[in-house]
Curated annotation (Swiss-Prot):
The protein's name in its UniProt record: Photosystem II protein D1 3
One Pfam family per UniProt: Photo_RC
Highest taxon of the lineage: Bacteria
PROSITE patterns (alphabetical): REACTION_CENTER (PS00244)
UniProt source species: Thermosynechococcus vestitus (strain NIES-2133 / IAM M-273 / BP-1)
Length: 360
């Protein structure tokens, strides 16, 4: 009897790389989306940290009046931000090689574009990586669908809104106070608080927080005790156990009696779908609202006040909102224009009925 021994063919380097990338045995799954996600998020993070600490002032309005955003130029953690690229650049793609010098690139806010483009590519790839890992493990794909809500929101404020407004200088600054400034100006120019899609987003976020707290407290209150009174109930759970860890019938009975019977879920799968779908759909609507307001399809306005039979204005909350919007619009970009667009385009109002007499 003859035994033939053959040497096992060694995998070439590319096949080893493919096997490593798609392996679900790694401590952290890489995946093909991860191959692009890792360098883009690293580039965005490194540039953000450097710019937040040391970037020179940026001519955001394109009128040769730079705005400081970094820590080394007088800001703190609250006021600091990566300032959006200049209005003089508009929507032009502005990588480093398009500038005459590095100083010019920094002056025109080039780091902002570098950060948001790499960041958006990175979070898109993170979403794809979630789908890829679910596929490898034989799971359903709804994790990446849920993650699409914050991805849509980030895309709306960093990409869609600047495109609609015609300049990346209108994008959201990368900082705490800059975010608040963006919100105030957005309200002033688009009346977002009166937009139904934003209202759905508020209901989604606050409702999701409420439902999450209700669910967590109900589960915690109806745990099946596997321990003695002197031990924590948490020690009664073993990872991977087949038994239920809480009594859904007890939780259903409690909540049904607290409100009414049909307010409580008796199906755990339907319950958890609802907990996921409510905030996701709400945030989808908010992102859609931002994307429509980007092209000036704004929230409801009540610019025509309610008047009585004699023509006297009956003040409502709408008048207060209008006045607040005008005030915020006057304050922002104070040197780029003298009046907000609403005032500059309206009919001139007389400020004096009779010419004053001058005693010379």
């Amino acid at each position: 009897m003859t035994t033939v021994l053959q040497r096992r063919e060694q995998l070439n380097l590319w096949e080893q790389f493919c096997s490593w990338v798609t392996s679900t045995n790694n401590r952290l799954y890489v995946g093909w989306f991860g191959v692009l996600m890792i360098p883009t998020l690293l580039a965005a993070t490194i540039c953000f940290v450097i710019a937040f600490i040391a970037a020179p002032p940026v001519d955001i309005d394109g009128i040769r009046e730079p705005v400081s955003g970094s820590l080394l130029y007088g800001n703190n953690i609250i006021t600091g931000a990566v300032v959006p690229s200049s209005n003089a650049i508009g929507l032009h793609f502005y990588p480093i090689w398009e500038a005459a010098s590095l100083d010019e690139w920094l002056y025109n806010g080039g780091p902002y574009q570098l950060i948001i483009f790499h960041f958006l590519i990175g979070v898109f790839c993170y979403m794809g990586r979630e789908w890829e890992l679910s596929y490898r493990l034989g799971m359903r794909p709804w994790i990446c669908v849920a993650y699409s809500a914050p991805v849509a929101a980030a895309t709306a404020v960093f990409l869609i809104y600047p495109i609609g407004q015609g300049s990346f200088s209108d994008g959201m600054p990368l900082g705490i106070s800059g975010t608040f400034n963006f919100m105030l100006v957005f309200q002033a120019e688009h009346n977002i608080l009166m937009h139904p899609f934003h209202q759905l987003g508020v209901a989604g976020v606050f409702g999701g927080a409420l439902f999450s707290a209700m669910h967590g407290s109900l589960v915690t209150s109806s745990l099946i005790r596997e321990t003695t009174e002197t031990e924590s109930a948490n020690y009664g759970y073993k990872f991977g156990q087949e038994e239920e860890t809480y009594n859904i019938v007890a939780a259903h009975g409690y909540f049904g009696r607290l409100i009414f019977q049909y307010a409580s879920f008796n199906n755990s799968r339907a319950l958890h779908f609802f907990l996921a779908a409510w905030p996701v759909i709400g945030i989808w609507f908010t992102a859609l609202g931002i994307s429509t307001m980007a092209f000036n399809l704004n929230g409801f306005n009540f610019n025509h006040s309610v008047v009585d039979a004699q023509g006297n204005v009956i003040n409502t909350w709408a008048d207060i909102i209008n006045r607040a919007n005008l005030g915020m619009e006057v304050m922002h970009e104070r040197n780029a224009h003298n009046f907000p667009l609403d005032l500059a385009s309206a009919e001139s109002a007389p400020v004096a009925m009779i010419a004053p007499s001058i005693n010379g």
